[in-house]
Amino acid sequence: MMTLIIPRKEAPVSGEGTVVIPQPAGDEPVIKNTFFFPDIDPKRVRERMRLEQTVAPARLREAIKSGMAETNAELYEYREQKIAAGFTRLADVPADDIDGESIKVFYYERAVCAMATASLYERYRGVDASAKGDKKADSIDSTIDELWRDMRWAVARIQGKPRCIVSQI
């Protein structure tokens, strides 16, 4: 996918007036995970989260690795239980398949994608003191909150736990 940005007619044009964000170079290797959890392909993360080439490969890789490490930590006890039950990989744990993929693997990748993207968005917020900038920051904050929620829900789904716990005081 290539993104082409063409300025509005009334906007001042400098140089050629067109900015082209090129396609990914295709040289982003898959990130190897621990023995139990699936490897993560940065290209799939870019596609799922619509990041295109607006994020440098090194930054995306760091965010994904952080997302993998944190998700793995969240699922440590779950992993130990499944290993004790005789499963060597998350993909081997009994679960429904959707589109040929274990739903547990799908939710794992969703958790990593959401966490990596939330982390990137938190660090890429623009600085704009105008009212328009405040509105954009509020929108980004809302998106970040939704991504963190998606991560928590995906982890809960892997563990077979409810997405939220409500108690009466």
From Swiss-Prot:
Annotated GO biological process: viral capsid assembly
InterPro entries: Phage_head_completion_GpL
Protein family (similarity comment): To phage HP1 protein ORF20.
Function statement: Carries out the completion of filled heads by rendering the newly packaged DNA in filled heads resistant to DNase. The protein is assumed to bind to DNA-filled capsids.
Listed name of the protein: Head completion/stabilization protein
Organism: Escherichia phage P2
Taxonomic lineage of the native organism: Viruses, Duplodnaviria, Heunggongvirae, Uroviricota, Caudoviricetes
